[in-house]
Amino acid sequence: MNEKRKRSRVRGISPDDLVEVLRRRIVSHDLPPGSKLREVELTTEFEVSRARVREAFGVLEERGLIERIPNRGAVVTRLEVEQIYELYEVREVLEGLAVRLATQKAPPGSWDDLVALFGQPAEEAIARNDLEFYIDCIIQFRERCAQAADNSVLNAQLDGLYDRTGVLIRRLVLVPGRALDGVRQHQAVLQAMQAGDADLAEETKRRNIRSAAEAFAKYQKYLL
């Protein structure tokens, strides 16, 4: 199904849904950095008012996904290298905290299925170069941690970070050896969570993010 036909299904949508559709296009790189979002085209496509489109632009701008530039309009944000390092610094702290809270709050046995998922299934997926399976494992891990951490402020901050770094994360798993390293690192995090050791789980998760930042530093000219 082509993009035009897919998009025809989302006409006349609510303000929240309009934001979500545009967010997904940006995060998936259907709208890559530097792309211009044109009010007139969007009002026609979605059959909504220009005021509603501007409202959606305001939400996306607050999330750091677009910027509104005088005489140019709304443009998808292009991350600079320094910003990416800053995002990794914040992710390290916040993801570490999420893992800590999840470990402290979740009942025993909560992580058994994820431990199994990151075992043979994830390893076999990497061996056959099924990186989408690995990315899905990461998404499941994040969602479960967010649910168990049960902190709406923290989860909102992390959602914003994931939106801004989603494409980069997908590119990073293509770096030789990175996906397998990620599986091993998540195995270690989950083992600590399964044991109820919040201190170790947090530190292990923070090392995982530092490792990702180091991989980005090594291969950044191929990733940007």
Annotate each PLM feature.
Residues 102-106, 149-153, 169-176, 216, ...:
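Long, hydrophobic, amphipathic alpha-helical segments used as structural scaffolds
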